[in-house]
């Protein structure tokens, strides 16, 4: 099994004698011109998250029909979006570059061979210099502290394109997919209209799950998570998820179990992700053994009592041990619309945080 780049990947190892290692200063003050950043769905109110999802869906239908909304036309003209990626990427890179171009901007890709946060110069220096030359930074990094420090010292908006703790762009795309699938076309309420829906996550507790759980709490969607023992959601993350539901009239409930059948009971959507992420190569055999019985199959859905018209989602790349071909390529699968929606989610995020300077109404 080839480990994927989504969760907790380690930075490329560099000989100590070859470079000087720096860490970002904790004594330096935050920029007085601090813009608004998107580091996690926890940074958004329920209304803001709803707006980002709805805008993503609306822009999708407008642009695909050949009508680019007036407020988007050339909205990033003359602006450069720096894409600082220390992890390899397919969907995130393509969607971010495509979104920037759609808005008339110039995407500048800086891979791990071009720039490494905290290597050769401090992260503070990198943040200050890069943000002085571009209009936004989209960062795909290892530790959450890296993107948090980058945002702390940047004078332009920073959008988290993945770290070991969160993946907000994926969450926007996921809920756009759910919204387009489950919300009636005649829906005119202020919410996404997903209250009472149930998602079952079967697999590893990772960054994609964490932002999905925060989103679910804000949207009134119940989320049942089944992981093997020892792979549960960390206590600190559970607290953040619970916090996300505060102030919501009917917040989504978070349920944890070690039994997949319990999670999928009465579920409308079954979701999984990679079992072995980059940085976990040495754990591969251990993880494969631990996750036996956690493959999503039609039989699992039937045994657990998933709702009759249940759907399946996966953020990709997918490996066959995570979900059967029968489910992955069936009419229950939303994986390819979900992948496409990464583009529209990126457009919505750039509009909200760069074009509109964080004013999301």
UniProtKB/Swiss-Prot annotation:
The highest taxon in the source lineage is: Eukaryota
Q: What coarse category fits the chief subcellular location reported for this protein? A: mitochondrion
Enzymatic class: transferase
- One of the Pfam families matching this protein, by short name: OTCace_N
Q: Which residues bind L-ornithine?
A: 207, 273, 277-278
The record's active-site residues are 315
Q: Which GO terms describe its cellular component?
A: cytosol; mitochondrial matrix; ornithine carbamoyltransferase inhibitor complex
Q: Which GO terms describe its biological process?
A: arginine biosynthetic process via ornithine; citrulline biosynthetic process; L-arginine biosynthetic process
Molecular function (GO) terms for this protein are: amino acid binding; ornithine carbamoyltransferase activity
Q: Which residues bind carbamoyl phosphate?
A: 89-92, 140, 167, 170, 315-316, 342
Which family does this protein fall into? Belongs to the aspartate/ornithine carbamoyltransferase superfamily. OTCase family.
Q: Under which name does UniProt file this protein?
A: Ornithine carbamoyltransferase, mitochondrial
This chain is encoded by the gene named: arg1
């Amino acid at each position: 099994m080839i480990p994927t780049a989504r969760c907790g990947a380690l930075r490329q190892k560099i000989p100590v004698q070859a470079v000087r290692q720096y860490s970002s200063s904790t004594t330096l003050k935050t920029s007085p011109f601090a813009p608004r950043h998107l580091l996690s769905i926890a940074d958004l109110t329920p209304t803001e998250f709803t707006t980002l999802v709805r805008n993503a869906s609306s822009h999708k239908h407008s642009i695909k029909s050949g009508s680019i909304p007036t407020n988007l036309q050339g909205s990033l003209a003359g602006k450069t979006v720096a894409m600082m990626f220390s992890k390899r990427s397919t969907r995130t890179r393509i969607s971010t570059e495509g979104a920037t171009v759609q808005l008339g901007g110039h995407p500048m890709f800086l891979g791990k061979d071009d720039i490494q946060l905290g290597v050769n110069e401090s992260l503070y220096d990198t943040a200050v210099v890069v943000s002085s030359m571009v209009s936004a930074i989209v960062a795909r990094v290892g530790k959450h502290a890296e993107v948090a420090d980058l945002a702390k010292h940047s004078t332009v908006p920073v959008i988290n394109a993945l770290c070991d703790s969160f993946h907000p762009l994926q969450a926007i795309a996921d809920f756009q997919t759910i919204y387009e699938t489950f919300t009636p076309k005649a829906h005119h309420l202020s919410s996404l209209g997903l209250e009472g829906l149930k998602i079952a996550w079967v697999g590893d507790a990772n960054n994609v799950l964490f932002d999905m759980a925060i989103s679910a709490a804000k949207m009134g969607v119940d989320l049942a998570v089944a992981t093997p023992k020892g792979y549960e959601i960390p206590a600190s993350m559970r607290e953040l998820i619970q916090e996300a539901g505060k102030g919501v009239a009917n917040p989504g409930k978070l349920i944890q179990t070690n039994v997949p059948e319990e999670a999928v009971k009465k579920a409308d959507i079954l979701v999984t992700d990679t079992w072995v992420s980059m940085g976990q190569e040495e754990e591969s055999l251990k993880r494969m053994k631990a996750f036996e019985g956690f493959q999503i199959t039609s039989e699992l859905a039937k045994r657990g009592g998933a709702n009759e018209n249940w759907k399946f989602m996966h953020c990709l790349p997918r490996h066959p041990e995570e979900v059967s071909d029968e489910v992955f390529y069936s009419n229950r699968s939303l994986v390819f619309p979900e992948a496409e929606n990464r583009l529209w989610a990126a457009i919505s995020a750039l509009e909200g945080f760069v074009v509109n300077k964080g004013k999301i109404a």
